[in-house]
Amino acid sequence: MVKAKKQYGQNFLIDKSVLAKIIQAIPKEMNNIIEIGPGLGDLTQELLKISQVKAYEIDNDLIPILKKKFQKELECGKFNLIHQDASEAFNPSLDEKPYFLVANLPYYVASHIILKALEDKNCLGLIVMVQREMAEKFCAKEGNSEFSSLGVLSAMICERKILFDVDPQCFNPPPKVMSAVMSLIKTKDFDELCEIENFKNFLKDCFKAPRKQLLGNLKTYKAKVLEVLSTLGLKENIRPHEICVDLYLKIYDKLKDEYGRKQRDK
């Protein structure tokens, strides 16, 4: 029996009914799937029934187990196993062809990988299992106290949905928190809307004190922000979680030269 390793945030999914629900949720036309952290290969086995699969696995001890389990699929080219940390594999894409991402993501690296995937032009969307709290952040709507930069970024380019919760007892070892499977289906790319690095820096400033007023978080640009809020008919004491994506893009549009300059001066 292989023991899960804490340093990789491993919690092996052992509930077959959860695997079935994940497979059912994958859009039918997806025929190139990337999996991150295949673990013991239980989800991989189901994915291979509907698509070719490329899997990224960081754990040395799991590579021979996966090679043995999927020897036939590896030989015929239906399965491609990459021994690499997936978070370092976006150069800039996880694959040269359009792909759909499916994963039970380690909690410590989940937000980083999801954002990288959203920025990857070849990624069509993703269905991932993450900590319930993180799924709520990615799928939150404006006005909800959970609405943050993660919610803004995902709402900009995706149709978003929390599909179902997953109890700790569905894993070995059981995590200390509730998990959830969420779906982010891309409808556009960031570069159709903004220069993403500058926009992320702008959002970082907007949400640096999420319960404070937006004007206070952007006090460096107070005069311009006041002008924009007035033009858009927004109250001066509005808070970051109360602003929708379209308005964030409009506010950023007035400040983008400042953020472009900041990026160049780094």
Curated annotation (Swiss-Prot):
The keyword Nucleotide-binding does not apply. It catalyses: adenosine(1518)/adenosine(1519) in 16S rRNA + 4 S-adenosyl-L-methionine = N(6)-dimethyladenosine(1518)/N(6)-dimethyladenosine(1519) in 16S rRNA + 4 S-adenosyl-L-homocysteine + 4 H(+). Keywords: Cytoplasm, Methyltransferase, RNA-binding, rRNA processing, S-adenosyl-L-methionine, Transferase. It is found in: Cytoplasm. Its main location: cytoplasm. One of its GO terms (molecular function) is RNA binding. S-adenosyl-L-methionine binds at N11, L13, G37, E57, D85, N104. It comes from the Bacteria. Its EC number is 2.1.1.182. GO terms for cellular component: cytosol. Specifically dimethylates two adjacent adenosines (A1518 and A1519) in the loop of a conserved hairpin near the 3'-end of 16S rRNA in the 30S particle. May play a critical role in biogenesis of 30S subunits. Belongs to the class I-like SAM-binding methyltransferase superfamily. rRNA adenine N(6)-methyltransferase family. RsmA subfamily. HAMAP family: 16SrRNA_methyltr_A. This is Ribosomal RNA small subunit methyltransferase A. It comes from Campylobacter jejuni (strain RM1221).
